Amino acid sequence: MKSLLPTTGLALLLALSLTPAQGEEVTLEHQGLTLNANLETTGANWPQGPVVLMTHGTLAHGGMETLQGLQSALKDRGISSLSMTLSLGLDNRHGMYECATPHSHQHTDAVAEIGAWLGWLQGQGTAKVALLGYSRGGNQSARFAVEHPEVPVNAVILIAPQTWNEADAEQDYRQRYGKELAPHSQL
């Protein structure tokens, strides 16, 4: 039993050292909703930049494992990051969006929230910002950059960006299933 104690202690210390970085939760009010994000800084002078503003994929959240890992890797390289959780129409949303919850948000709602977080970063004194979007967040980050060229963004990083075109989706469905994509009126 004695020989297991040092091994168990070493394994526990190793596991704790591999845990993704846990930054500070920050919030802001936007269009009647509280938005939240995870701020991972590299020290007291973090606003001097660069800072990466991260947007997650469909129905996910800013604390998802992929983004936590990216925040940790960025911090290891001396880069601060802010991983936002899109509200998806819910106040102070945390965690995955429940599929059973009625969806009233629009794909384009994220553009305004990205702008709100960029405004927050500018208010902190940040001048060097890169947008990073993962999956659907990649599409939304690219959309923000195109629709708001007046906002200073130093880089746009897209990881597996979601792309979608209604006509292409309908054609793909027709080819796959041999029928038109249309609402089903009978359940």
Cite the ranges covered by each PLM segment.
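Alpha/beta-hydrolase active-site loop
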Residues: 101-123
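N-terminal cap/lid segment of alpha/beta-hydrolase-fold proteins
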Residues: 21-44
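Cap/lid segment of the alpha/beta-hydrolase catalytic domain
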Residues: 87-105
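Gly/Ala-rich beta-loop-alpha elbow adjacent to hydrolase catalytic centers
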Residues: 133-137, 141
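Bacterial N-terminal signal peptides
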Residues: 8-17
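Short, surface-exposed "cap/lid" segments of acyl-processing enzymes
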Residues: 46-47, 52-77, 81-86
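Short beta-strand immediately N-terminal to the catalytic nucleophile in serine-hydrolase-like folds
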Residues: 131-133, 159
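The alpha/beta-hydrolase serine catalytic core
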Residues: 35, 102-105, 152-187
